Design a protein with these regions (language model features):
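STAS-typified acidic loop motif
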Residues: 2-30
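Amphipathic alpha-helical interaction surfaces in cytosolic regulatory modules
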Residues: 22-97
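Short acidic-hydrophobic, aromatic-tinged amphipathic segments that line or gate anion-handling sites
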Residues: 98-103
Length: 103
């Protein structure tokens, strides 16, 4: 798992690559939370275009960042999920949540 972050105005864009599993989520989670806290971030955009696999720990990481952004009055978007990741998002119910609240 590899990731990159970039701030564009008040948005933090996080590009994830590879597999999201229990071995990598704590590092990603902690770094994203740190960047949200120290920068003036009001939107979090998570680019899933290069994610090949995601397990339940990835779902937990996404939901935790969503709750963090909502508690700050911000918003979060998931963009470009690959078909297999999109299916995980759909089965977990997260896809519906993001379509409804983050369009």
């Amino acid at each position: 798992m590899r990731y990159e972050t970039e701030q564009i105005g008040g948005a933090l864009v996080v590009k994830l690559y590879g597999e999201i599993d229990q071995h990598c989520v704590s590092e990603i989670r902690d770094d994203i939370d740190r960047q949200i806290a120290i920068r003036n971030i009001n939107s979090l955009i998570v680019d899933l275009g290069a994610v090949e696999f995601m397990e339940s720990s990835g779902i937990g990481m996404i939901m935790g960042r969503y709750k963090n952004m909502v508690s700050r009055g911000g918003k979060m978007m998931l963009v470009r999920p690959q078909p297999q990741v999109d299916k995980v998002l759909e089965l977990s119910g997260i896809k519906k949540l993001f379509e409804k609240n983050c369009g």
